Amino acid sequence: MKVDQMFDLDLRKSYEASELSPQASIIKTTIKVSKAVCKTLTCICTGSCSNCK
């Protein structure tokens, strides 16, 4: 699975849930996307990668 596919999946999930709670959905999606990027790129855990564990 490519990185852009992971983004697409997470964004679709956020749009489906956005009717109930847009702000909570955006926060959850942001965390999911940042974790996916960190795991994929195996970045040094700094800043945006702090929740990659």
From Swiss-Prot:
Modified residues annotated as 2,3-didehydroalanine (Ser) in this record: 25, 50
Record protein name field: Lantibiotic paenibacillin
Main function: Lanthionine-containing peptide antibiotic (lantibiotic) active on Gram-positive bacteria. The bactericidal activity of lantibiotics is based on depolarization of energized bacterial cytoplasmic membranes, initiated by the formation of aqueous transmembrane pores. Lacks antibacterial activity against Gram-negative bacteria.
Main location: secreted
GO MF assignments: signaling receptor binding
Modifications the protein undergoes after translation, according to the UniProt entry: Maturation of lantibiotics involves the enzymatic conversion of Thr, and Ser into dehydrated AA and the formation of thioether bonds with cysteine. This is followed by membrane translocation and cleavage of the modified precursor. The structure of the 2,3-didehydrobutyrines is not discussed in PubMed:17071789.
Propeptide intervals in chain numbering: 1-24
Entry keywords, A to Z: Acetylation, Antibiotic, Antimicrobial, Bacteriocin, Lantibiotic, Secreted, Thioether bond
Positions bearing the Beta-methyllanthionine (Thr-Cys) cross-link: 40-43, 42-45, 46-49
Cellular compartments per GO CC: extracellular region
Modification sites for N-acetylalanine: 24
